Amino acid sequence: LHDALPISQLEAELGAPLFDRVGKTVRLTGAGETFLGYARTLLATVEQAQAALQLPQQISGRLRIALADSVCSTFLPDLLQRYHAQFPQVELVLCTATDDGMLQMLTTNQVDLAYTLDHPLLQPTLVRAVDVPEPVCFIAPAGHPLAARDTVSLEELVQQEFLLTERGMSYRDALDQCLAAHGLQLQPYLELGSAALLCQMVERGMGLSFLPEYIVRAALAAGTLARLNVPDCRVEMHRQLFYHRDKWLTPQMKGFIALVREGTAQSAAPTQA
């Protein structure tokens, strides 16, 4: 009776029955189904208002992020350090996956955000919060004979020993497609999922590779790697951060997106002499 009384009062106030009560079975009526949608929206609005009034240090909960391997190894350490400093109570759950796998995880609500490296993706169910073009380049050990050349042809490249990322990764597939368009094929002697490890192996003189520029930028600046100029194969991927269109943008998600945007703006800003 204690539980039934408020429902009865609500039904009287709305002027419509919310439940069908047949014996011990209780089901929502058509009016009940309609009201349920509004009730859920109202509760979500209250939760959002409560979250908006919290200080970052007070926000808790969990943030689940899927990332591309190269994004993880390059951008994540600094990003996580800054995020944890702002949101010390938030639990971070991270995983790496292929780009297709990450988008599927968003669709099935296994993760809150997906940080990909791929061609520009336009999907009506996803919101793209960050989009940064990233060139991919051929690299060789410093002192390699091809490093002294102004340009290198694809025909010359395929004669070299290569270490590449696994098939199914966006920029590896783009390389294979570029070669196929010129009637060529490249068979690496080693395939590896870690772009950062490939960079180190090329530095050791173990072969050539094809990697995002942000992975090799420090080694290029240090002179331990050389970038090869290959006019017939220009590849650009996009570093993109997504969330699902139907998902409420939580304070935890907003904080992460803001830090990614901030880092992107800082890296794009011209350095002053």
Where do the language-model regions lie?
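Acidic, Gly/Pro-rich loop/turn segments at junctions of secondary structure
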Residues: 86, 97-160, 167, 215, ...
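A late-sequence structural motif
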Residues: 75, 226-270
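Hydrophobic hinge/microswitch elements
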Residues: 98-111, 117, 170-228
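Short, small-residue-biased leader/transition segments that mark boundaries at the very start
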Residues: 1-5
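Central regulatory/effector-binding core of bacterial HTH transcription factors
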Residues: 60-122, 192
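Alpha-helical linker/hinge and terminal dimerization helices associated
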Residues: 13-16, 35-57
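Secondary-structure junction motif
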Residues: 117, 146-147, 161-182, 249-253, ...
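A short LG(V/I)-centered, amphipathic sequence patch enriched
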Residues: 9-28
